[in-house]
């Protein structure tokens, strides 16, 4: 059985930037762009909050509404998670969370430790 929340690489510094207009999530590793992922963000009536946050919790079995994994942010009731509606990726359709394809959130779940900074712009 794998650990819940391993540090991906001791000493490696990660940062996440979510671009709500471009519908993209970028991961920076030690200050350099490492990976980019397409996302869905909040719809106009429930926009994704902008600002500086951190990953405060992780859930490996969040239930069908949140896809394969959940990365909870320091913003109340907001997270980065998977989806069982892959057709929603690339659109502004969520209740404020950031959605990714399930294989992408699986990768981020194991890559990003709790405490990782997340900027949403």
Question: Predicted regions: what is each one?
Answer:
Residues 2-13, 43, 47-53, 57-121:
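Exported/periplasmic cell-wall-interacting domains
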């Amino acid at each position: 059985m794998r650990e819940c929340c391993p540090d991906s690489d001791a000493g490696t510094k990660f940062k996440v930037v979510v671009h709500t207009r471009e519908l993209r999530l970028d991961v920076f590793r030690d200050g350099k762009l490492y990976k980019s992922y397409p996302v869905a963000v909040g719809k106009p009536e429930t926009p994704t909050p902008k600002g500086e946050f951190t990953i405060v919790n992780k859930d490996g079995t969040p239930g069908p509404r949140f896809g394969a994994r959940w990365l909870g942010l320091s913003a109340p009731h907001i997270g980065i998670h998977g989806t069982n509606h892959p057709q929603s990726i690339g659109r502004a359709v969520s209740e404020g969370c950031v959605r990714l394809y399930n294989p992408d959130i699986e990768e981020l779940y194991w890559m990003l430790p709790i405490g990782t900074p997340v900027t949403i712009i």
